[in-house]
């Protein structure tokens, strides 16, 4: 990451944006983790239901975004990093949408994902009544450990050419204990720093990583 103090001076006393200050263009990042689709359903209500004292929701729009490890990928791409991702999606509409959105960024980003025939893609569906979120529907199932070896084989092809390894764990099964241990050890052998966004409450699963970034809730539960 390149950020020289004189850059601020030359550009007019600190008027560079954070994106300009953080130059990721020469950084190769491997992101491994749980891919999700964030689905925001927008709508309104103009009456109550006769069946129960609840509003009748009328959808009038939908916005889809990369979620989970995909959100990390999107942020890194926006910063200019050369990013590759290893994860799992289902052979379904949710998986197709994740691939479609990723391809609008760069067709190579999800070149190494696994499409699991029997797996349901994780979808976080948020219902917005006007600007207020009133409900979240989670469509998900944990990934079988039989995919551990496939994930590790995909990572073996990419990790040696990476400058940073990011493990985005939402505890959906991609980053099993076996995968975590193997990837952290491999990164240490190659002297590649590992950053973990944790979900498991037992942080010993991430032993050997360089940086762990829990939010306050995750930190209190650990």
Predicted segments with their positions:
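Extended active-site and interfacial segments that coordinate phosphate-rich ligands
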Residues: 47-51
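Accessible peptide chain termini
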Residues: 1-2, 18
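Divalent-cation-assisted or electrostatically stabilized phosphate/pyrophosphate-binding catalytic cores
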Residues: 53-60
């Amino acid at each position: 990451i390149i950020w020289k103090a004189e850059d601020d001076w030359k550009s007019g006393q600190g008027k560079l944006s954070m994106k300009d200050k953080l130059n990721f263009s020469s950084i190769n990042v491997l992101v491994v983790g749980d891919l999700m689709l964030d689905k925001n359903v927008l709508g309104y209500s103009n009456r109550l239901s006769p069946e129960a004292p609840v509003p009748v929701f009328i959808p009038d729009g939908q916005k889809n975004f990369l979620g989970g490890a995909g959100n990390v990928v999107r942020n890194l791409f926006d910063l200019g990093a050369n990013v590759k991702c290893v994860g799992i999606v289902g052979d379904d509409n949710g998986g197709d949408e994740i691939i479609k959105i990723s391809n609008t960024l760069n067709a190579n980003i999800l070149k190494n994902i696994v499409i699991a025939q029997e797996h349901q893609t994780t979808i976080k569906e948020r219902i917005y009544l006007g600007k207020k979120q009133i409900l979240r529907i989670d469509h998900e199932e944990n990934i079988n450990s039989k995919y551990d070896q496939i994930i590790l084989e995909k990572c073996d092809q990419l990790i040696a050419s990476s400058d940073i390894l990011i493990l985005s764990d939402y505890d959906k099964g991609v980053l099993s204990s076996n995968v975590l241990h193997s990837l952290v050890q491999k990164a240490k052998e190659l002297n590649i720093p590992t950053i973990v966004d944790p979900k498991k409450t037992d942080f010993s699963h991430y032993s050997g990583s360089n940086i762990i970034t829990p939010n306050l809730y995750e930190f209190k539960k650990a």
